[in-house]
Swiss-Prot record:
Pathway: Cofactor biosynthesis; molybdopterin biosynthesis. The lineage of its organism: Bacteria, Pseudomonadati, Pseudomonadota, Gammaproteobacteria, Pasteurellales. It comes from Haemophilus influenzae (strain PittEE). One of its GO terms (molecular function) is cyclic pyranopterin monophosphate synthase activity. This is GTP 3',8-cyclase. Binds 2 [4Fe-4S] clusters. Binds 1 [4Fe-4S] cluster coordinated with 3 cysteines and an exchangeable S-adenosyl-L-methionine and 1 [4Fe-4S] cluster coordinated with 3 cysteines and the GTP-derived substrate. GO terms for biological process: Mo-molybdopterin cofactor biosynthetic process. Catalyzes the cyclization of GTP to (8S)-3',8-cyclo-7,8-dihydroguanosine 5'-triphosphate. S-adenosyl-L-methionine binds at Y39, G80, S131, M202. It comes from the Bacteria. Its cofactor is [4Fe-4S] cluster. Its EC number is 4.1.99.22. Keywords: 4Fe-4S, GTP-binding, Iron, Iron-sulfur, Lyase, Metal-binding, Molybdenum cofactor biosynthesis, Nucleotide-binding, S-adenosyl-L-methionine.
Length: 337
């Protein structure tokens, strides 16, 4: 069994062969989603027959404890749509109470926010990312397949009322669809503490033609921001991949996630676990390493941690999107994007 390095204060024991430290876990808790976004699940969620069920609350708790002991400080609950789980609040509360977990985030389509966001705050969810691909209700409906724009906007307002001092909003950038709304998004965040994040469309196995038609480099937006006085900010060790820009005249921020940019992977600090218990070292990578068999009792913790550490030693230096290699992923819903 490969030995795991001793954890010093402020360090992670999750270190790969390129000396990148991992503080951040993206944990999918369901593949199911009630939206039909054109870039992700245009035909809606299709359950697979005779496939394993999603991780239980007990298994999720054991997993989160193992990662926390190895230096993980931030866990993000993803899906699918994580809030569709009936035990979502219990999952969040359990993770929030684990020693060492300083940040518990959720990525959501916002469908339940207006109703439930105050409870999310109470149980320890520290930050929220909500998907809003357009500020035009008709375009929102066209992209998501769901006529819920007003509900999502109301949910963002409720998040501020519940005590969140910032909300992150994700928008997948698509040429000739929502890229025309960039100025409108800037106006929207002028007086609102929203970090508006534009995510470059990423190529996956099922979406080659869609990618060719709608991909637009985030550098186009970066150039506009820099030209107009926006300033690129430094990252903390638990931040995600977004390049964040601020402007003295704006309450909000702009984030750009550009996976095709040179050296995008150099600062990688996050691992992923699927809703059925497989560890994924990269969004565009391998089939996954099975962890579920070691999530049944606390006595398995040391073996579980050794398996995670050993798997990490096989992490690649970077993805190969630039040469069209998208790995084995047909779409991103199964491991939370």
């Amino acid at each position: 069994m490969q030995s795991i390095p001793i954890k010093n204060v402020g360090e992670s024991r999750l270190v790969d062969p390129f000396q990148r430290q991992y503080y951040y876990l993206r944990l999918s808790i369901t593949d199911q989603c009630n939206f039909r976004c054109t870039y992700c699940l245009p035909d809606g969620y299709q359950p697979e027959a005779n496939k394993p069920s999603f991780l239980t609350l007990k298994e999720i708790t054991h997993l989160a404890q193992a990662f926390a002991e190895m230096g993980t400080e931030k866990i993000r609950l993803t899906g699918g749509e994580p809030t569709l789980r009936k035990d979502f609040i219990s999952i969040a509360e359990s993770i929030a109470n684990i020693e060492g977990i300083r940040q518990l985030a959720v990525t959501t389509n916002g469908y339940r926010m207006a109703k439930d966001v105050a409870d999310w705050k109470k149980v320890g969810i520290t930050s929220i990312n909500v998907s809003v691909d357009s500020l035009d209700p008709k375009m929102f409906h066209q992209i998501t397949g769901i006529n819920k724009f007003d509900d999502v906007m109301r949910g963002i307002d409720r998040a501020f009322e519940a005590g969140y001092n910032k909300v992150k909003v994700n928008s997948v950038l698509m040429k000739n669809l929502n890229d025309k709304e960039f100025e409108q998004f800037l106006v929207w965040v002028k007086d609102r503490p929203i970090q508006m994040r534009f995510i470059e469309l990423m190529q996956t196995g099922e979406m080659d033609s869609f990618f060719d038609r709608y991909h637009l480099s985030g550098q186009v937006l970066a150039d506009k921001l820099l030209k107009n006085g926006w300033i690129l900010q430094h990252k903390s060790h638990t931040d995600g991949p977004a390049k964040v820009f601020t402007h003295s005249d704006y309450a909000g921020e702009i984030g750009l996630i550009m996976p095709y940019e040179k050296n995008f992977c150099a600062s990688c600090n996050r691992l992923r676990v699927s809703a059925k218990g497989k560890l994924h070292l990269c969004l565009f990578g391998e089939e996954g390493i099975e962890l579920r068999d070691l999530l049944q009792s606390h006595e398995q913790q040391a073996i579980l941690q050794a398996r995670i550490f050993a798997a990490l030693q096989g992490k690649r230096e970077h993805h190969y999107l630039h040469i069209g290699d998208t790995g084995v992923r047909n779409h991103l819903a199964s491991i939370g994007g």
